[in-house]
């Protein structure tokens, strides 16, 4: 008997299954009951629930339909192999061998053109093509077995006739393409069958076995090996071929199919079935055996008889009924149609076990209307939160908002636990880092929510697997410095080469200093001094020779690796040697036996085997051996290129099951998969974006099924719509849906998934007052709006962001200029260099010394491209080094710069060297007569009025750049003039004025100017120094807003109107000109003090007090050409 149980709730179906086990125990207590399921997750849930119901769940087997049916073939048909010779993987490898043989034939011109025009290697493209064709053949075997038989008979025109009959209006060009695709696919299939027969005596595929097994079942006298009964649970749809097999078996044993039907009314296709037949169908009521229920309600029947009601696939909607069910339910509707259609010729016992939805909440009303095939306005309560839609600015914000939502739910409902929550996304790998970042850390006093991740790829979740696959894909790598250093972040790899975590900062410093940028070999495309080989030669040479000892065999010792650091340099060299050998190996194609050796050696060469890694290394080794054995079985002897083997191993390793984490007593994060939507109190859907869901799958142009539709065909977007419907119906108390609704860059609105839009339109139809609106969340976690109690349930629990949220940039409390009187230390002495640094940039000094905040405006990453131009820092370094060299040593210096990888390669380097040489020689003329510089110590006391008392401050340190008998301060900068260059010589000169007689005014020399600083009297100099020291002391408690980073003289003015504009310029970058100052940018972004004229006046007054004397007497400036 074929028994179909129709219910809208899995809990009820589970209850029926449990009662069957109790009332009808198996005759043999040792025989396993067979329960077909769609996924291991459904089996896991069912086992747990049956154990709760009966106290135990044992001796149950949960195969997938395809594997179970193949097992039936193997047990009952003698010629059937235990392993399917026509599985997708085997067909792919065979096709890789066969396709090249046929490429010269006229029918195969589309394949020939595809392979020849590929930018990738032809073999890799052949591998991809073979995989696509194998997948297509596998689909034909299940959904179009009649085409397979037509090809085997050589009757290709049968297929094109079927397509033309269903689509008579196809244009001639497309139909010709379909005919061509049919011919080459038929020829390839016939060759595939012959190839399988050469290895296996009987090349029997699933379609042929299907017919043979049906014939066997039709023979009542023939012996058969069948289970005593079969249960089918939690499968939304079965391929027609599988259903036919199970229906045929039902003449021998009982088949119990549990169909999770979202609607208790008939909502399948009506036009293809006779109305009188449908009207006669009855349903038996579970627990009400004396009552039968007709297939149609009275309203439906009346409308049908009056021709008001038509449900067809072509229209994809119901003229009367529930629009959501019509739009999303195609997969279930087709299967329902097939089940009802087959009741006419298959003895079927249909049982209805629908559960009424008792809740009056928005979610309950929605589920109830779907159950009853209704379409009426919903009653939306003002504070109903059973179904909420959330718009965020990014995936990270989606997870943060979800975290707050769940914490709020747990607060409101103490009975709710983490295991009652499932969170499903279109692609769990995309969200994994955000989930781990938000749910994996503790936010102040807020407790962590336990969570588990299912379905993420092993390459995304295991660092050893990820790095192993990275190594396999190094064939086309340019070995950039950053890419290689990332490998050393992997503990198992780092330890294999005896490099510790503490060594990594030094390794990065060496890589930077040795000029490594990209490339493995030094002699790659000419001499590449930025390669790993060149850099490592410098490190190794540096162990014995310092840079000053000159070039040895086109290399230069690296000073920082000199002496005791030689062991680390040797370990790095060992790592490089292994990478270089691997790269060379990957350039060649190899047999599978050789690849087995290479892949195994890769594990031992690059990864340390210890307690943490041994299991995963063993697993990878197992997969390598399985692949090798499989290809040997198929007699695949072609040599494989590295990109193909990398792809194959990736697929092997990513198939690792981790779905057992699905029901682990925690919040379940997983991918939205068929029948993953088992009942949960809280169902959350993330990433419901327009571009991401329903997921798109571009059809192959040679897929013939797309031109010939049959009920039961699987279409990815239709499947996703049904998954969304299942998720909505699986929520028992709450359903939460979120998407990225605004751009994080410009805040422009972005559309949600069309399914979300349809849901919102359906809920709000006919609503006048209370409509369901999308809750829009702030872009940042620290927005003040997140911490306000409101009716939209958006309050944040992340207390770590509360201080920032409470920060008000418009209030006085936000000002950097507030005093910091806590833990004030008494200063009795000031070092000269510290005082100069303070005066040169008082804002930066405050951030770094008082707040401990350091802004870096340069990219810390190592460049990964050839340097056709010199960076500003390299240019400055070269110029200043050459200033101290004699002209006859310039050539050696430039040669060293080339070997160090500083100068651009080839002619570019020569041009740069010539330009630098000319500029340096010109500047050397300006400083040629200075003689040798001297330095002098400074140590004296200053009397400073500060904090309402007179304090004696010791000023001490050293002054350099003193020239001549009179120790004149002369500073030079090999750069264009900037006002701030005057500050150091100015302070030195002030000290000379205070501490010695007849101090000579200081001088500044730059590329474009030579200027003498203004002479001043001792008392004036003392007063000026007292201003600097007093403000230095004051900077302990208050930032000193004196702009020194651009033209200081712009702020020694009496006109206040242009000051705001000049301040704003400090925060702006100007092409190749000055860059924005990060410290001033931060100050001006977080203070409103300069909106008041009195504060601008204060800034001008202080700037004039600091530099009025220095920049007032412009007549002392001299310009030299």
From Swiss-Prot:
Q: Which UniProt keywords apply?
A: ATP-binding, DNA damage, DNA repair, DNA-binding, Exonuclease, Helicase, Hydrolase, Nuclease, Nucleotide-binding
Highest rank taxon of the organism: Bacteria
One record GO biological process: double-strand break repair via homologous recombination
Q: Could you tell me which InterPro entries the record lists for this protein?
A: DExx_box_DNA_helicase_dom_sf, P-loop_NTPase, RecC, RecC_C, Restrct_endonuc-II-like
Question: Which GO-annotated molecular functions does the record name?
Answer: ATP binding; DNA binding; DNA helicase activity; exodeoxyribonuclease V activity
Q: Which GO terms describe its cellular component?
A: exodeoxyribonuclease V complex
Pfam families the UniProt entry points to: Exonuc_V_gamma (PF04257), RecC_C (PF17946)
* Gene3D superfamilies for this protein: 1.10.10.160, 1.10.10.990, 3.40.50.10930, P-loop containing nucleotide triphosphate hydrolases (3.40.50.300)
Q: How does it assemble?
A: Heterotrimer of RecB, RecC and RecD. All subunits contribute to DNA-binding.
| Family recorded in the similarity comment | Belongs to the RecC family.
Other information? In the RecBCD complex, RecB has a slow 3'-5' helicase, an exonuclease activity and loads RecA onto ssDNA, RecD has a fast 5'-3' helicase activity, while RecC stimulates the ATPase and processivity of the RecB helicase and contributes to recognition of the Chi site.
Protein purpose: A helicase/nuclease that prepares dsDNA breaks (DSB) for recombinational DNA repair. Binds to DSBs and unwinds DNA via a highly rapid and processive ATP-dependent bidirectional helicase activity. Unwinds dsDNA until it encounters a Chi (crossover hotspot instigator) sequence from the 3' direction. Cuts ssDNA a few nucleotides 3' to the Chi site. The properties and activities of the enzyme are changed at Chi. The Chi-altered holoenzyme produces a long 3'-ssDNA overhang and facilitates RecA-binding to the ssDNA for homologous DNA recombination and repair.
Spell out the PANTHER family in the cross-references. RECBCD ENZYME SUBUNIT RECC
Instruction: Please give the name of this protein.
Output: RecBCD enzyme subunit RecC
